[in-house]
Design a protein with these regions (language model features):
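Acidic (Asp/Glu-rich) sequence patches and key acidic residues
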Residues: 1-103
Length: 103
């Protein structure tokens, strides 16, 4: 199992820290990629081989934890999400940023 931190790919501005976006938009975007909570209002979103852990009641969302439970399936989903939503993923054990393929 691998654990990553999900961060915005943009830098903070003078108006405050960069965010991943409004919670509702994140839920909508991830739902379109087969990743969603088990019940409305849930803070853990489940997808193929992955789960996102959101901080309770955080809006806008600054960062999330991403747990990769099935590496064979999960990496394809992570690459699609990262490219589509322009997020970056950092390994919490090494501090290395995940480099997504450019296909």
């Amino acid at each position: 199992m691998r654990i990553l931190v999900v961060l915005p790919s943009t830098s903070p501005s003078d108006r405050g820290p960069a965010t991943l976006g409004p919670r509702a938009a994140i839920l909508k975007n991830l739902r379109s990629m087969n990743t969603q909570p088990e019940c409305d209002g849930g803070d853990i979103l489940y997808g193929p081989g992955i789960e996102f852990q959101l901080a309770p009641n955080q809006d806008p969302v600054v960062q999330m934890i991403l747990v990769v439970s099935d590496e064979d399936i999960g990496w394809l989903v992570i690459e699609r999400i990262g490219r589509t939503l322009k997020w970056k993923f950092v390994d919490i054990n090494t501090g290395d940023e995940l480099v997504l393929s450019t296909n």
